[in-house]
């Protein structure tokens, strides 16, 4: 049966093609701010019970789409699936965030690292991708919106692997980077190979765009960022399948705190660059000069403001970018668990409505 994508606005925006309006999706759009997500998570018993069960992962992936007219679905998973598949023993303790039972800190630890067999260790992820694609598609082969796959970046994965969890200052991983760069590069090399294989497996399973989350790239100094993060993102991008089933598969990279390096990130071969809220979107568009699309960049805490302020700030982001192709509206980071779903509805409505006016010249 031929498959038809009913809403391809997101994919066309990533490829800098004209669209009738600005598409929107939200980082962490399936998450704790939704009561239905919390109900599903309670049934699953734990976060990992949710993420590692394709049925539950599919259910929560679709929840925000059933509530809001978003323009893309994103696979429900976690960025730490790869190091978990490497045998580091991922666990989530209530109120503590992710922890690894076996952090990577010594020469012997690094020597044991290997690229995991994706089918064998991460089949639950590719299974979820296939199941979500089916759930997005009706009996006539019509798919509602595209599905985004994702991974953490090699550096961001290394931060958690070496620290053994989250960190305020990343002193353990940074100390390794400066005192034993040979070990750091060995970790990053394995991670880059694993991330590329993982994203390609998601593409083969049906992901129609992929995103690399470099959450902690901005923790690095200039120079160190290029050596320990950007170079390895470039390696990943060079290995990715850019076409599947006759369709292009766009690639997005997001470095939180990476606005300083926008031009360099845009030169890695990606189709789009995600931006946090510290960057002026109009200036960023001029800096990349049409080489890539841009994704972002509303401060997620604006969603705590009254609806009129949410709408005003959404218009400000759209006005900053201007009436040009190549913009995907998003937050500058993941949505807070304390956000009101009603305010998200206001945001999505304003982005769609106001961007249509911009296209027609009726805004103002």
From Swiss-Prot:
One biological process term in Gene Ontology: protoporphyrinogen IX biosynthetic process from glutamate
Annotated EC: 4.1.1.37
Pathway: Porphyrin-containing compound metabolism; protoporphyrin-IX biosynthesis; coproporphyrinogen-III from 5-aminolevulinate: step 4/4
Compartments, as annotated in UniProt: Cytoplasm
Alphabetized UniProt keyword annotations: Cytoplasm, Decarboxylase, Lyase, Porphyrin biosynthesis
Enzyme kind, highest EC tier: lyase
Domain of life where this protein originates: Bacteria
GO molecular function, one term: uroporphyrinogen decarboxylase activity
Positions contributing to substrate binding: 28-32, 78, 160, 215, 333
Reactions this protein catalyses: uroporphyrinogen III + 4 H(+) = coproporphyrinogen III + 4 CO2
Site (Transition state stabilizer): residue numbering on this chain: 78
Pfam families listed in its UniProt record: URO-D
GO cellular component term, pick one: cytosol
SUPFAM superfamilies: UROD/MetE-like
HAMAP family: URO_D (MF_00218)
Subunit structure: Homodimer.
Family classification: Belongs to the uroporphyrinogen decarboxylase family.
Role noted for this protein: Catalyzes the decarboxylation of four acetate groups of uroporphyrinogen-III to yield coproporphyrinogen-III.
Name the record gives this protein: Uroporphyrinogen decarboxylase
Annotated source species: Burkholderia vietnamiensis (strain G4 / LMG 22486)
């Amino acid at each position: 049966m031929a498959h038809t994508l009913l809403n391809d606005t997101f994919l066309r925006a990533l490829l800098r093609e004209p669209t009738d309006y600005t598409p929107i999706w939200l980082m962490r759009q399936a998450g704790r701010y939704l009561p239905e997500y919390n109900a599903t998570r309670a049934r699953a018993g734990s976060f990992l019970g949710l993420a590692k069960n394709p049925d539950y992962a599919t259910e929560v992936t679709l929840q925000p789409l059933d509530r809001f007219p978003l323009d893309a679905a994103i696979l429900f998973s976690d960025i730490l699936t790869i190091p978990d598949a490497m045998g580091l023993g991922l666990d989530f303790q209530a109120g503590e965030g992710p922890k690894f039972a076996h952090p990577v800190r010594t020469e012997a630890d690094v020597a044991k690292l290997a690229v995991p067999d994706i089918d064998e260790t991460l089949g639950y992820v590719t299974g979820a991708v296939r199941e979500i694609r089916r759930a997005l598609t009706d009996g006539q082969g019509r798919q509602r919106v595209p599905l985004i796959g994702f991974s953490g970046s090699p550096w961001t994965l290394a931060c958690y692997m070496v620290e053994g969890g989250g960190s305020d200052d990343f002193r353990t991983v940074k100390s390794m980077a400066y005192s034993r760069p040979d070990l750091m590069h060995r970790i990053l090399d394995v991670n880059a190979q694993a991330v590329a294989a993982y994203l390609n497996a998601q593409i083969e399973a049906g992901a129609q765009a992929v995103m690399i989350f470099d959450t902690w790239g901005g923790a690095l100094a200039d120079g160190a960022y290029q050596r320990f993060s950007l170079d390895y993102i470039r390696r990943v991008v060079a290995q990715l399948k850019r076409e599947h089933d006759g369709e292009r598969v766009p690639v997005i990279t997001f470095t939180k705190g990476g606005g300083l390096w926008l031009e360099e990130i845009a030169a890695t071969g990606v189709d789009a660059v995600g931006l946090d809220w510290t960057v002026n979107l109009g200036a960023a568009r001029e800096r990349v000069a049409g080489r890539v699309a841009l994704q972002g960049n509303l401060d997620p805490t604006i969603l705590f403001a009254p609806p009129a302020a949410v709408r005003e700030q959404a218009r400000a982001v759209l006005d900053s970018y201007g009436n040009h192709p190549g913009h995907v509206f998003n937050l500058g980071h993941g949505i807070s668990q304390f956000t009101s779903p009603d305010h998200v509805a206001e945001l999505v409505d304003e982005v769609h409505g106001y961007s249509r006016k911009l296209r027609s010249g009726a805004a103002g």
